[in-house]
């Protein structure tokens, strides 16, 4: 299987999100990369499902709660920017203050 660098990046984010979900299920608090991966994966999958940029900007801020993260992590993440493929092309989605 020949994957482009972009496809490899998408797979790594998806795998990191799977690991993060498993840790949440076990009650383990998320670190910085895990929280980013969950939000990013949510936006990418939502785009593939045909949701709007505005919808994903709002909904992306509800994926991870502050109490699910290690101390200090919510304050470290101000914005998450995701380049996602929508039915009408690739767009940049910015989730402001993603962990509340």
UniProtKB/Swiss-Prot annotation:
One example of a Gene Ontology biological process annotation: urea catabolic process
Keyword flag Repressor: no
Signal peptide region: none
Enzyme Commission number(s) from the entry: 3.5.1.5
Entry GO MF terms: nickel cation binding; urease activity
Subcellular location: Cytoplasm
Keywords recorded for this protein, A-Z: Cytoplasm, Hydrolase
One GO CC term, this protein: cytoplasm
Listed pathway(s): Nitrogen metabolism; urea degradation; CO(2) and NH(3) from urea (urease route): step 1/1
Enzymatic reactions: urea + 2 H2O + H(+) = hydrogencarbonate + 2 NH4(+)
Keyword Isomerase: no
NCBIfam families named in the record: PRK13241.1, urease_gam
Name assigned to this protein: Urease subunit gamma
Organism: Dinoroseobacter shibae (strain DSM 16493 / NCIMB 14021 / DFL 12)
